From Swiss-Prot:
Binding site for ATP: G110, T111, H112, G113, K114, T115, T116
Gene: murC
InterPro entries, sorted: Mur-like_cat_sf, Mur_ligase_C, Mur_ligase_C_dom_sf, Mur_ligase_cen, Mur_ligase_N, MurCDEF_pg_biosynth, UDP-N-AcMur_Ala_ligase_MurC
Organism of derivation: Desulfitobacterium hafniense (strain Y51)
Name of the protein: UDP-N-acetylmuramate--L-alanine ligase
A GO cellular component annotation in the UniProt record: cytoplasm
Superkingdom classification of source: Bacteria
Catalyzed chemical reaction(s): UDP-N-acetyl-alpha-D-muramate + L-alanine + ATP = UDP-N-acetyl-alpha-D-muramoyl-L-alanine + ADP + phosphate + H(+)
Endoplasmic reticulum listed as a keyword: no
Length: 449
């Protein structure tokens, strides 16, 4: 009899991806439960023939293993019932670590760029015939969703530093896209974040490899027993890009790896940050034996992932784009990328701050992140379910600070009011860019309906 593995909160992006690859790797019977509200992952789970039930303690009674989303605590009826029956309960990172241990792991970590870099590598490996297993934190059209169950030796996974979750993994290869202070509800300061990345770097075996951004100020703090390969825009990096030209369809550049010119490369996603994501992907793929021409060709066809500078549509000659950026560096990079690709458009950024703790701790950094925008609209803060203190900072104070930086900024309380304001003020040539990890994407969708 195959194992029966039940996923509590299966509609989450990570959980739905994990459920799909579990069915393949474990040869298990998979069930899941979640709220009735429909998400994009419903279609993913339907295609995988994974049943999704309403929450009920009875759902776990015949399960051999329960995997629980971080969104639900020990008091949840299904988790509590599993504990009563002595059924093993895994967290998402614990179970991902279990699956990765069965293959050659590739972990993509870093404060920013994890999803895009994972998706880029996944596409390159698939198109080169390596056939990896992939778990990624977004819908990626080029790999057919947020997961792929391959027959090959490699297990590629987006790996988050929050609460040191990635220490549950034992990868052979590790990418660190960048290291910055984030998740202030867990990490004390930047040193604490660096310590976490050092801890996972030390888990990489001597025969493995670590790939890290050459220009990262924290790079030299990472100590490891395995060789470290650098990527960046500096010629001192092991893998770097030169002769970079930006245009409205992305960028063109020359790739150099370990002193050898690999050739010209076309990237169809905008911004310097995506060039760095591509360089990390190229460095990794070359190291594991993917032919140069396969790497460059496959990445030249990469068109992005859901909620990463995703083109939603147009309205009255205005372009509507959505992005998941919710950290000051991500916002700055996304807006600067938009300015490079669309120099003649009026850029109207609509930002929904994500969590009170992040907004409070990084308030000054946020206020200085919108210089590339012509106008900024700040929505109400999107609170995390794990937050208890919701009165530490206000969204209107962030709008005021942005205005003090010389940027036209305003606070508008509700998404409905923002939709109305934008609909009434759209002009041909505008670029409306919604930013945030909450539900701000609904604004862009409403403008193209």
């Amino acid at each position: 009899m195959p194992l029966h593995i039940h996923f509590v909160g299966i509609k989450g992006t990570g959980m739905s991806a994990l459920a799909q690859v579990t069915a393949h790797i474990e040869g298990a019977h998979i069930t899941g439960s979640d709220v009735p509200e429909r998400f994009f992952t419903d279609a993913v789970l339907e295609r995988a023939h994974i049943p999704v039930l309403n929450f009920s303690a009875a759902n776990v009674e015949k399960a051999d293993i329960v995997v629980a989303s971080a969104a639900y605590g020990e008091n949840h009826e299904e988790i509590a019932r599993a504990r009563e029956l002595n059924i093993p309960v895994y967290s998402y990172p614990q179970f991902l670590g279990r699956l990765m241990s069965k293959k050659r792991g590739i972990a993509v970590a870093g404060t920013h760029g994890k999803t895009t870099t994972t998706a880029m590598i996944g596409l390159a490996l698939l198109q080169s015939g390596i056939d990896p297993t992939i778990v990624v934190g977004s819908d990626v059209p080029s790999i057919g969703g947020n997961a792929y169950s391959g027959q090959g030796d490699f297990f590629l996974a987006e790996s988050c530093e929050y609460r040191r979750h990635f220490l549950n993994y034992s990868p052979e290869y590790l990418i660190i896209t960048n290291i910055e202070f984030d998740h202030p509800d867990y990490f004390k300061d930047l040193d604490d974040v660096v310590c976490a990345f050092s801890e996972i770097a030390q888990k990489i075996p001597p025969h493995g490899r670590i790939f890290i951004w050459h220009e990262d100020p924290q790079r030299k703090a990472i100590q490891a027993q395995s060789p470290i390969i650098t990527f960046g825009l500096n010629e001192e990096a092991d893998v770097y890009a030169t002769n970079i030209q930006f245009h409205d369809e992305g960028s063109t550049m020359t790739i150099v790896a370990h002193g050898t010119v690999l050739g010209e490369f076309h990237l169809h996603v905008s911004g310097k940050h995506n060039i760095l994501n591509a360089l990390a992907s190229i460095a990794l793929c070359l190291e594991i034996g993917v032919p140069t021409e396969k790497v460059l060709e496959s990445l030249s066809h990469f068109n992005g992932t859901k909620r990463r500078f995703e083109h939603i549509g147009q309205n009255a000659g205005a372009l509507i784009v959505d992005d998941y950026a919710h950290h000051p560096t991500e916002i700055r990079s996304t807006l600067e990328g938009a300015r490079l690709s669309f120099p003649d458009r009026r850029i109207r950024a609509v930002f929904q701050p994500h969590t009170f703790s992040r907004t409070e701790k990084l308030l000054q950094e946020f206020s200085q992140s919108f210089q590339a925008a012509d106008e900024v609209v700040i929505a109400e803060i999107f609170a995390s379910a794990r937050e208890t203190n919701l009165n530490t900072i206000s969204a209107s104070s962030l709008a005021d600070l942005i205005s003090q930086q010389g940027v036209n900024a305003r606070y508008i309380h509700s998404l409905e009011e923002i939709q109305t304001y934008l609909a009434q003020t759209l002009s041909p040539g505008d670029l409306v860019l919604t930013l945030g990890a909450g539900d701000i994407y609904k604004v862009g969708q409403s403008l193209v309906c």
